[in-house]
Design a protein with these regions (language model features):
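Membrane-embedded alpha-helical segments and adjacent helix-loop junctions characteristic
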Residues: 10-96, 230-232, 236-305
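Hydrophobic alpha-helical transmembrane segments in multi-pass integral membrane proteins
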Residues: 115, 119, 190-199, 239-258, ...
Length: 372
C-alpha cells in the first residue's frame, strides 16, 4: 500500500492498532512459559488417562480442548495437543479422524468464551471496550451450548466407529511437568484475570502480566521469547495497514454502505442473523480476522452496537468450523496429522463442519439476542 502510493508512510504507522499488538504479546509471553513448562501436554495427558471408552475420549477432546482454548488461544492448544493425541492413539489401531476433527472444532467453539480465546475476540474486546467479565458472562452459555452441540453431532456422525471398543488400553505418554514454572505461569494468568475483572485495560494488564512472568519465571527469557509468534504480530500490523489502504481507496466505505443497509434493522433477530450470515461468508473467503477488521468502523454506528459486536465475535469464531480452511486451528490439526500419516479430507471435514456451524450459529444468535 505504501510502495504503490495508496497510503503515505505516516498514515501506515497510524493505522497500526498497538493496543491489539500489545495485548497479543502479553498473552504470548504467559502462554509461552506455560508451553515451556509443558502445561498443555500435561493437561492433554490428564484427559487421555481418564478416557476409558471412545465416546469419553471424544467428549474429553472436544470439551477439554474447548475449555483450554477459551483462555489460552485455540491455535496454541491445537498445536500442542495434536501430537499428544496422535501419540496416544497410535498403538490403539483406531482411526484418529473423529478425535482430530473433534479437537479442532472444540477448540474453535470453546475459544468464543473469552477475549483471550482467539485473535478476533481480542479485536472485538478492545474495539467494543467490553470488560473481560461482561464478555465472559454473555458468551458462557454460547460456548457451553456450542460445545454440547459439537460433541453431540460428532458422536452421531461417527457412532459406528465410536461403538467399537478399544483393542488396547489407552496409554498417554507421561509428561515431565515443570511444576514451579507452570504454577508461576498460572498465577500470572490469574493476576491478569483479576486485573481485567477489576476493570483494568485489556492490553495494559496483559503486557504487565507478561512482563511480570518474565521476571518471576526464573528461566532464561529466550525460551518464552522464542515461542512468541512474531510473524503473527507482523501479520496483524500489516493487516491494519492493508485495511487502511482499502479504506483510503473507498472499498471499506462501499462495504459499510451495503452492510448498513443489510443489518440496520429494528429487529435484533434480523440484524444478528444478517451479521452472522455475512461474517460466515467473509470468514471463509478472506479469513476471520480481516472480516472482523472490516466491521471496525461500521458497528459503532449500528443500533445495539454491543450486541452486534458480540454477534461478530461469535459468528466469526463459529464459522471457522464450516470448512477445513475456515480457521488456522483446523489447518494446524490437519498439518500435524498428515505429518504423522493421518489425513483429514476436505469432504469429510465439511460433512461435519457445515451442520455443526449452522447449529452453533443458530444457538449463538438465539442466546445473544435473548440475553441482549
Amino acid at each position: 500500500m505504501v510502495v504503490f502510493g495508496v497510503l503515505p508512510l505516516p498514515d501506515a504507522y497510524a493505522a497500526v492498532d498497538f493496543d491489539v499488538l500489545v495485548f497479543l504479546l502479553g498473552m504470548m509471553l504467559i502462554v509461552g512459559y506455560l508451553e515451556v513448562g509443558k502445561f498443555f501436554e500435561w493437561a492433554a495427558e490428564w484427559v487421555l488417562r481418564r478416557a476409558g471408552t471412545s465416546e469419553r475420549l471424544l467428549l474429553g477432546v472436544v470439551v477439554g480442548g474447548g475449555l483450554l482454548s477459551a483462555f489460552f488461544v485455540n491455535d496454541t492448544i491445537c498445536l500442542v495437543v495434536t501430537p499428544v493425541l496422535l501419540a496416544a492413539l497410535g498403538p490403539m489401531r483406531v482411526r484418529p479422524n473423529p478425535y482430530l476433527i473433534g479437537l479442532a472444532m472444540g477448540a474453535n467453539v470453546g475459544s468464543v468464551l473469552s477475549v483471550t480465546g482467539n485473535p478476533q475476540n481480542m479485536l472485538v474486546g478492545i474495539w467494543s471496550r467490553a470488560t473481560f467479565g461482561g464478555f465472559l458472562v454473555h458468551m458462557l452459555p454460547v460456548a457451553l451450548g456450542g460445545l454440547a452441540l459439537t460433541y453431540g453431532y460428532l458422536r452421531w456422525v461417527y457412532r459406528g466407529e465410536l461403538r467399537e471398543p478399544f483393542r488396547e488400553r489407552l496409554e498417554a505418554v507421561p509428561v515431565a511437568l515443570d511444576r514451579p514454572l507452570v504454577t508461576r505461569g498460572l498465577a500470572m494468568f490469574a493476576v491478569a484475570v483479576a486485573g481485567w475483572l477489576a476493570g483494568g485495560s485489556l492490553p495494559l494488564v496483559a503486557i504487565a502480566a507478561g512482563a511480570l512472568m518474565v521476571l518471576v519465571a526464573q528461566r532464561d527469557p529466550a525460551y518464552a521469547i522464542e515461542r512468541v509468534d512474531w510473524s503473527l504480530l507482523l501479520f496483524f500490523g500489516s493487516l491494519f495497514v492493508v485495511m487502511r489502504g482499502f479504506e483510503q481507496a473507498g472499498a471499506v466505505a462501499w462495504i459499510d454502505r451495503h452492510a448498513l443497509d443489510l443489518v440496520e434493522s429494528d429487529s435484533p433477530w434480523r440484524a444478528a442473523t444478517a451479521v452472522s450470515a455475512v461474517m460466515a461468508t467473509l470468514s471463509n473467503l478472506i479469513s476471520n480476522v480481516p472480516a472482523v477488521i472490516l466491521w471496525r468502523n461500521t458497528v459503532p454506528h449500528l443500533p445495539q452496537a454491543q450486541l452486534i459486536w458480540r454477534v461478530v465475535a461469535m459468528s466469526s469464531t463459529f464459522s471457522g468450523n464450516l470448512l477445513l480452511i475456515g480457521s488456522m486451528a483446523n489447518l494446524i490439526v490437519a498439518e500435524k496429522a498428515e505429518a504423522r500419516g493421518a489425513r483429514i479430507g476436505f469432504g469429510e471435514y465439511a460433512r461435519v463442519g457445515v451442520p455443526v456451524t449452522l447449529l452453533t450459529l443458530a444457538w449463538g444468535i438465539m442466546v445473544l439476542v435473548a440475553t441482549g
